[in-house]
Amino acid sequence: SRDGMLSSVFVSGSDVYTTGYEANGNYDVAKLWKNGVATTLLGGTHSDAYGYSLAVSGTDVYVVIQEDQSVNDVVKIWKNGTVTTLSNTNTDAYAYSIAISGSDVYVVGSERVGSTYVPKIWKNGQGTFLTSGANDGEAYSVFVSGSDVYVVGSESVGNIEYARLWKNGIISTLPAGTNNAS
């Protein structure tokens, strides 16, 4: 038995897919399990890698991976055995969720610009920031309904972290409470 963690599950027909990571010596390895059978996706030789979210569309399996390279954390997507880098490799980036709608693939997370983490959405590999970058923020989940794309996350303004909802790129602030969002 090895240390590891599962972070996402997807059921397609009678197949159960999970993703996460498993420790392999000095490094963590991103893995995909289909009905309990593991496939190594990335990592394990010179870097750590983690599977964060997955989706299945027809026969295509997609996994969002974060690879902790020696200098920066990089967002990648694994599709049927092929790994593609989504984020700028010259800065830190994180991704937490994926959604598929038709032939469109959406991934959300954040990317560091200077010293600020800016919420970001990637559609078919093309990234778009969701805020101006004036404040730290994250995008945690994406959902597509028809032609509408919904993203939830947070943005820190001063000492308060606000819950945010974006619909088709338009930001809304959820009703304010007395405490920080979580």
Regions from the language model: what does each represent?
Residues 1-182:
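Residue-level hotspots at or immediately adjacent to binding/recognition sites across diverse folds
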